[in-house]
């Protein structure tokens, strides 16, 4: 005699209560209404406290909350001469923002009332795409609140499977009888959620598909070029003979500039110090400073290492030493040529032809030959369209081939074993439970501790662990910032979804259970129990608490950025002079990491979509998170991070991940149908069909999106001349920051900085003292030449002719 679905469901509920949640777990232990009211109240209180503390720190802590504004206002000109009465655009915009940012809490209201146009003018086109993506998610989740709270939640609550004492459980799908026809509503709405989300993402894509002329380049990046070739004419000759009618306008060789870039940064740092104290000495006389990093810790002047020295002389001598080292390294760079070149052509059609000729070289196809084929060895070349010069990380170009792949594989293998086998948050917390660490907490029997503490701990792990992924991407030494952000985004998202959604949902909450689930053959026979963990009432409450914590306490901590604040305060405390403090402020204003922020946001979005049907009360809290995240990101992009510009791959990857997020909800419904109503039930078959159709639609959308973007790179009908494609004779008018040459090699005129100082009394001139107006003019010109492009790492799209 077979058991009924109802009795089978009751049996599984009894089994999984002990199997999914450890007997003394402080994380997944049931509480009245899941502890949600307590967690919500505590998060509101903490969020208010964090905002108040940050309002004080943002200006009290040496302009910590306004670093993005300081990278424009703290130029050498303002450092030496003070703020000027007349500022050219866009500096006027930043000064206006500073004038509006005078009160204790004006920054908060400015973030709410800030116009999108002001944000886009300062932060660039990528900021517009990012906030538009958030707008689409917010509107989508807002629409989801209507069926989730108006239809699914009442249907769940009027069910009869659970007792009336189970307050939170009655709001979940567990309370719906397996014989009820209302289960059709859950399956239908899960499929409708996917279709609606797909439509919203498609509409969002229409707003940032790259225009033809903006993304087309006439420059090719060629690797595996023999390093013995030193004459650009050899490369030009090959292309001219192999492709008749081809005109090469420029050939750029690449060099190993890792050491040169580091020396240049130190040299410019010393240069700022010398210029600052030279100007200050003219006004107030000789300035004495302590140069030891720990001099602020000791107020005694008797220690030799803490003695004061002449600031102007110190920085002049330091600049002279670093300049000599820089010039010596600059002379050696020519001997460190890489097997990588950038070739710019006059005709866009030629670029397409050459690129297609080398596209299938790995399949045995031979490219066109020339009389110098044996010299250039073009059969070994790998040809690709060149990224924008501002997108290239020049110091990483020297790390390639075996060393790059060995580093990449070693780093990611370590991360995989660390994250997926040992350190998911639920595994760590329950492993701690095994050693009685949390027994004092259990004795308190307070939902404040037993519910709020675990949700904060889960949030902390989901922040700290992706930071390891984030920093590991820098160790991988990617060639472009776009690829670096893309890798960060994919790794963080995949890791977070497994760590936060999939493993805890299936009850894999302790290391021994996880290893048994992976490797024990007999344990796998009872794998059905694992999937039942998805549908326990307390499991949904656990994820609601996580979303609440991320929405309030989490966004508050994103404002605070404790790690950056500690680093900032420490570096300022150990600084030796005002120029160093300006340098610290500028360097700490990092680019806004779109990849990391996308991953964190989409992780919470995936949690909401996974439980939007089985636990519909999570949807309004997901809306709260998206709204708070949007406000926080607007503030951070404008005030705390430097502008950045990437290619469309980052934003398209976010769209793909958002499209696949509702599939989790469909899979959850399929598991529920199989386990509760049977694998051959009509609801189960409908859920399976919905998943198949949704997967086909999702992959079709991805392929169509990639195809559409690929079409934009095809040759445009009407070509527009870009700054890269001008004739060599016009290079004098070409901005040096837009050449395919490392920035450190573009300014040879700055290798030596003629300025009188006590350390160097003469630079070979007859005049002992320059005219005051002449020196002031020179310093102003140098300041303008040195600063404008240094702190804007953004990728500017070429050929912007509107």
UniProtKB/Swiss-Prot annotation:
Upper classification of the organism: Eukaryota, Metazoa, Chordata, Craniata, Vertebrata
Protein name: Osmosensitive cation channel TMEM63C
UniProt keyword list: Calcium, Cell membrane, Endoplasmic reticulum, Ion channel, Ion transport, Membrane, Phosphoprotein, Transmembrane, Transmembrane helix, Transport
Transmembrane residue ranges: 36-60, 125-157, 181-205, 402-431, 447-476, 481-517, 541-573, 594-612, 616-640, 648-676, 682-702
Catalytic activity annotation: Ca(2+)(in) = Ca(2+)(out)
Example GO biological process: glomerular filtration
Tissue-by-tissue expression: Expressed in podocytes of kidney glomeruli.
Superkingdom of origin: Eukaryota
Quaternary structure and partners: Monomer.
Region: Disordered, residue numbers: 753-785
GO molecular function per UniProt: calcium-activated cation channel activity; osmolarity-sensing monoatomic cation channel activity
Membrane topology category: Multi-pass membrane protein
InterPro entries, per the entry: Csc1-like (IPR045122), CSC1/OSCA1-like_7TM (IPR003864), CSC1/OSCA1-like_cyt (IPR027815), Csc1/OSCA1-like_N (IPR032880)
Task performed by this protein: Acts as an osmosensitive cation channel preferentially activated upon hypotonic stress. In contrast to TMEM63B, does not show phospholipid scramblase activity. Enriched in mitochondria-ER contact sites where it may regulate the metabolite flux and organelles' morphologies in response to osmotic changes. In particular may regulate mitochondrial motility and function in motor neuron axons. Required for the functional integrity of the kidney glomerular filtration barrier.
Pfam families (UniProt xref): PHM7_cyt, RSN1_7TM, RSN1_TM
Extracellular topological segments: 1-35, 158-180, 432-446, 518-540, 613-615, 677-681
Source organism of the structure: Rattus norvegicus (Rat)
Compartments where located: Endoplasmic reticulum membrane; Cell membrane
